[in-house]
Amino acid sequence: SVAPNATPIEKIEQSVFFVRQDQKRARLENLLGDENLKRAIVFTRTKHRANRVCEQITKLGIESQALHGNKSQAARQKALEAFRNGEIKVLVATDIAARGIDVDGITHIINFELPNIPEDYVHRIGRTARAGAHGAAISLCDPSEQTYLRDIEKLIKNRISVAGGEPSNDETKSSVKHGKQQKNEVPQNNKRRKFKRFHRKRSARAA
């Protein structure tokens, strides 16, 4: 169920950019440069990705912290307080770690990765546009996530406005497999290595 103080989704400006996986970083940098962005949560599906994205944002000179299950309770509380007090501008979080976040003044929710559970999308974006304030929810969707996007639109009974790019018709088996691979919060390293080796071999054969 959605948190009691979550914003009704009709009041949130929702949009999606269709991008390749390797274009997401550049698009995120572009979004973070928006002068209207005062306080934002960037969502990822995995802890590893949250750390990577947080490092990228910090290198841009933007104060940020990662919030996920590998952080101690004390570290999570400290990050939340810093976010609430305006000491950090961006929080990079996984869905599980973000549960219970209740901070006013969040202007942007950025879905660096779309959730594979459509209800999580509603939970994510409901943290912006509170108390009549403006709020934007922007999603970056690569070909492997288009199924997730369709499920989300089915749930909210609405099409999300396309801000850039076009959906790919090439939702290949490998893309879908890649999307499923990301469902686990922290894929085991050896599985990930096997997965990469398998695709390198397939690419070599196809070349």
For the regions a language model picked out, list residue spans one by one.
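Conserved helicase RecA-like core
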Residues: 1-171
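Basic Arg/Gly/Lys-rich low-complexity intrinsically disordered segments
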Residues: 85, 153-207
